[in-house]
């Protein structure tokens, strides 16, 4: 079977469920990891650099991470991210690479990062594969973008500094044990558009039992959260 046909079959399987073949494991990245000192002006005209303190208020204002630090491959009409070698405190994924949109984070694509405190995904990303952020132990904040449709199993497994997650309107599917070992998470916002969410999306035995599930009344997320005995706040 030639490489082009194999890649096409793999993409079909990934779309069908984010399991099995899916995006393959990221290639070993031999790029030397360095930090940049780029500066981005915020709305308050204060400079945010990669040396700034990372807060809930400013993490989305950090400079975009240079594409040279990413391992990526073509997938469908754009690119999937398979790895990142940046040691900056914030990984701000670019919207496009080589003129094509970044549309997926592959399996373990941004996992095992020991320095990252926040991740910003562009609005072009539709798919986050399983274990995408696993063991990002210092990750506190994440922005998922407005086009996300599904997130795979164990995506935030071991992210024991993660404070909250807001899934965007239009999101459809949440995988198994997405928040395993997320010990300090305060709240998870889940829109009514999410209709596929398993009873074990949140593993209460190893997570914060006082987490708030913020979701509209009558939603699938409310039903599942109630079955797990989690606190529900209707929004």
Model-derived segments and their meaning:
Residues 54-84:
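Short beta-strand/loop segment at the start of cytosolic alpha/beta domains
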């Amino acid at each position: 079977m030639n490489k082009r046909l194999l890649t096409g079959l793999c993409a079909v399987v990934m779309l069908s469920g984010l399991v099995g073949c899916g995006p393959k494991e990221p290639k070993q990245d031999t790029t030397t990891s360095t930090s940049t000192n780029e500066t981005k002006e915020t709305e308050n005209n204060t400079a945010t650099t990669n040396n700034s303190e990372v807060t809930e208020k400013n993490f989305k204002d950090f400079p975009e991470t240079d594409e040279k630090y990413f391992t990526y491959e073509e997938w469908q009409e754009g690119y999937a991210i398979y790895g990142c070698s940046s040691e900056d405190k914030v990984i701000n994924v670019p919207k496009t690479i080589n003129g094509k949109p970044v549309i997926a984070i592959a399996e373990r694509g941004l996992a095992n990062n020991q320095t990252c405190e926040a991740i910003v995904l562009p609005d072009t990303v539709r798919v986050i594969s399983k274990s995408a952020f696993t063991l990002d132990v210092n990750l506190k904040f994440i922005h998922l973008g407005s086009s996300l449709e599904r997130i795979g199993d164990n995506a935030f497994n071991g992210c024991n500094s993660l404070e909250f997650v807001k899934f965007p309107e239009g999101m459809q599917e949440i995988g198994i044990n997405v928040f395993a070992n997320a010990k300090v998470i305060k709240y998870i916002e889940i829109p009514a558009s999410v209709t596929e969410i398993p009873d074990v999306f949140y593993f209460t035995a190893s997570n914060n039992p006082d987490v708030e599930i913020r979701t509209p009344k009558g939603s699938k997320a409310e039903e599942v959260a109630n079955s797990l005995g989690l606190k529900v706040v209707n929004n």
